[in-house]
Amino acid sequence: MIGLQLQNDTVTVAAYDDVFGEAARSAGLKIGDEIVDINGCDVSCAEDVRSVLNKDGQLPVNLTVRRGNKLTTLALTPRQTENGPRIGVYLRQGISGIGTVTFYDPEAGLFGTLGHGVSDASGSLLQMTRGSAYEAGVVSVKKGKPGEPGQLKGCAEGSGVYGDLFRNTPQGVFGTTRYGWEGTAVPTAAYGEIQTGPARIRCQVTGGTVQEYSVEILKIYPETRTDGRNLLLKVTDPDLLQATGGIVQGMSGSPIIQDGKLVGAVTHVLVNDPTRGYGIFIENMLEAAA
């Protein structure tokens, strides 16, 4: 399990403030809006917003926001608080989450995770400028049900950054680790070596131990497919089905092992059948990391 923090040079409205949120609501500011500038000053971090507010006080401010593919200008009157003027929203710069490490190359210090990209509020691939990785552990499990995806809820462990992220792609998130991981090296499988039939996935569901669980590879799609859906999987392990109901959020990146070789990673769950999901070929992840 690994914690991921991807950052970029955009500032997004994450939530309304419970007390002062009416200022933002009445101005038409919406969750998911990207703040481009305030009073003509470019915004690339939350501090840029605070700087203008502290300078102009309670005077109305003009916000240019990107909503989808359109730019909109909003007039907003900040509310005065004991900590200075506020526009009534919580701002987010980048995205945080958890996933599972798929592979680690000790010679290069390189690792890959998720097997799919991280998207911004508009659904587009997040244009990451920098990022950090942290050790993380599972604190609770929300079991998946048909129509209601489950989730591994995790939190960061330790006090420092464990690695640095350098690339967010449709085939996964990649970085370099400062410390590395212990484990047994396994060969990777070429596309032509992967077969339908029994396989194993490795993931951390409870406690701090990574365990293997049985799955079935039901279908293999063309190698050229780049959306992280190269394999159709079905969870067959009774222990995993009991614990999670199948594939859940937070398991993205879980390595898929077949005949002693790393063939890919778990990427998606079928919402209407959490026992089934998709995986990506390891070859596609390694190509994206190169």
Predicted regions mapped to residue ranges:
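PDZ-domain C-terminal substructure recognizer with occasional recognition of PDZ-binding tails
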Residues: 2, 30, 50-89
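PDZ/PDZ-like groove recognition
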Residues: 2-31
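Extracytoplasmic/secreted envelope proteins and their assembly/folding machinery
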Residues: 10, 29, 46-53, 98, ...
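Second-shell loop/turn segments in exported
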Residues: 18-21, 36-40, 87-88, 187
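Conserved PDZ fold ligand-binding element
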Residues: 24-47, 256-259, 263-267
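Short, surface-exposed secondary-structure edge patches
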Residues: 24-28, 51-54, 191-192, 244-247, ...
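PDZ domains, with a preference for the canonical peptide-binding region formed by the helix
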Residues: 37-70, 273-275, 279-283
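Serine endopeptidase catalytic core focused on the charge-relay Asp
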Residues: 80-245, 249, 258-259, 267, ...
